[in-house]
């Protein structure tokens, strides 16, 4: 099924209409924040996911035209039966809102700064953001750096991160940023009916130097850009499942033996919370098939690891064969950790 607003892939009826996650959240924000928009053109702008709808006035009008109707600010993903249900529902809604805000920053801004991973973790404002315009250069270097930054910012907003030691925090982010980016691109590609990972505006995830290195043998590139999205298509992963999987992956205390005892306890306790929430979601959506669904979802991690490792290896090979080619410092930090 496709979203009746922007034609992206859709799985649920939101506010009475089959719509995608992005349009659902756009409509929700507009209504509940009483936002007003004006069309700069002739009130007939094209609203399509491939062009990343820019006219909010026409987008909202289309939402109304196709029959979207707001219920109340207490509109929930699942029915509320008790306090446990309330906490579960609040968790899902908070994650959806947080992710939506993060994705908006990713596609709406860019930066010319070149800080290291450590610099950003210590003070993310060092990455001075500039709003994109139609004239903004949209190359793979810019998008990959911004994707990594957006993933770092997303996780930094969780309170438990502030409790971690600096060295443990750096290790945790070095391991997870590329994997989180891979999952994010897979979810976007899946939502937009794309067969492989791409950046917005269909910008390739590989620099031209990688194609030059591979020549006519692009099987590895096709595997890296296609295998994760293939798994998403196979499992028909929902937005809520993706968001919980992301946190289950991030809170993995076993990625190194060097974490402090305190960090291991914090990560393990939070991973248990997100694992429990994911299993509960499976129970609500799939009933008796919940254990099978839960196991299938966790199998995504193995494929993500393989894709990230292949990407890191290719990046290393590019730099070996073309010493003049340099990734930004943030990407160098991430790739060097994957290969260490």
UniProtKB/Swiss-Prot annotation:
GO cellular component: nucleus
MF terms (GO), sorted A to Z: DNA-binding transcription factor activity; RNA polymerase II cis-regulatory region sequence-specific DNA binding; zinc ion binding
Keyword Transport applies: no
Pfam families: Hormone_recep, zf-C4
KW DNA-binding (keyword) present: yes
Domain of life: Eukaryota
Protein family membership: Belongs to the nuclear hormone receptor family.
Full protein name: Nuclear hormone receptor family member nhr-268
